[in-house]
Regions:
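Active-site neighborhood of phospho(di)ester-bond hydrolases with catalytic His/Asp-centered motifs
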Residues: 26-30, 51-61, 80-83, 189-195, ...
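Binuclear metal-ion centers of metallo-dependent hydrolases, dominated by the metallo-beta-lactamase
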Residues: 78-79, 86-115, 232-311
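Metallo-beta-lactamase
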Residues: 3, 83-178, 184-185, 289, ...
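Pre-active-site segment of Zn-dependent metallo-hydrolases
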Residues: 17-61, 66-73, 96, 129-157, ...
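Active-site environment of divalent metal-dependent phosphoester hydrolases
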Residues: 34, 61-66, 86-89, 106-111, ...
């Protein structure tokens, strides 16, 4: 593992294995399965063998941290998240976990400068996506609900064990929503695994995001309940607030029944939302496709000292 690079490897939904200065962490922790098996070419035990030092939790729904307890049991990783996230994982594990608690109330933030040597981390509490009333006056967007592809299930049928795991974790509590920014040398990466309608429900979060150091790479969830009425309007609020140089969608794969969708089918909507920004403010889009981009660290290997990141 190179200690002079920042490396991220996607393993489904918004979960990444990441290396910062040679220190391995996870952001979210679920290998998608249950509606299929083997679609993502890894499993929780293999992820745990990366020996992560921390698991940064965005929120506690099944599709984000259903494997956290198992990975903690094998690796001893500490949890970074709200107290509710830690409590949920402790309940699943049946024992205490190392917990670095961050604020849960939207708009509150915390600086975590001593977790990873040479890495500064900002944790900002924000809000989950929600159903929205149509906002035709704000860009005249059409609905773009995800269209599930049952072909992936037919080609990769779920094992009884994987299906049972999915069902068992469906009730997992959300426990708050946290956005993280990781800063190494000149490089700043901002990641979040949901997008709420900030303008109406949490304008204080927009102000917090604008005050973060400039974002170079923005990894943002696409799936949102608001798609049913306003397509990716909520996503646009985060992109406008963070003003990144590079944008990469996440949580845009066919991860489960009915609400999953293939990345290729969501791509036109992502490009439309980014295209609504003024031309000078549009980030470059680094689009990824399931299942081809899973476990492809070359897609997200960065030299944090490169001049291109200097503002």
């Amino acid at each position: 593992m190179r200690d002079d690079r920042v490396i991220l490897s996607w393993f489904g939904v918004a979960s990444y294995a990441a290396s910062f200065n040679g220190h391995v962490v996870l952001v979210d922790a679920w290998v998608p399965r249950g509606s299929h098996s083997g679609y993502v070419p890894t499993d929780p035990r293999e992820v745990a063998q990366l020996d992560p030092e921390y698991i940064f939790v965005g929120h506690g729904d099944f599709d984000h941290v259903a494997d956290a307890a198992e990975i903690v049991a094998i690796s001893g990783a500490a949890i970074v998240g709200t107290r509710a996230h830690c409590d949920s994982i402790e309940e699943q594990l049946g024992e205490k976990v190392k917990c670095v608690a961050v604020p849960e109330a939207p708009g509150f933030a915390e600086e975590l400068r001593d977790l990873i040597p040479g890495v500064e981390v900002s944790a900002v509490a924000h809000i989950h996506s929600s159903f929205e009333s149509p906002e035709f006056a704000d860009g005249n967007r059409l609905p773009c609900p995800p269209i599930w592809n049952p072909g992936d299930t037919a080609q990769n049928p779920p094992t009884p064990e994987d299906f049972a795991h999915l069902i068992r974790h469906l009730p997992d509590p959300r426990g708050g929503n946290v956005l993280y920014q990781f800063r190494v040398d000149e490089l700043a990466i901002t990641w979040h695994d949901t997008v709420g309608k900030l303008r109406e429900d949490a304008p204080e979060v927009i102000e917090k995001l604008r005050k973060l150091p400039p974002t170079d790479v923005h990894l943002a969830a696409i799936l949102a309940f608001g798609q049913a009425t306003n397509c990716l309007r909520s996503l646009g609020m985060y992109v406008r607030a963070l003003d990144p140089d590079i944008f990469t969608p996440t949580h845009h794969d066919n991860f489960t029944y009915l609400i999953g969708a293939n990345a290729k089918d969501l791509e036109p909507y992502v490009r439309d939302e980014i295209g609504r920004l003024p031309k000078r403010a549009r980030p470059r889009i680094r689009y990824t496709y399931d299942p081809h981009a899973y476990l492809k660290p070359k897609l997200f290997t960065f030299d944090p000292s490169a001049p291109r990141w200097r503002d």
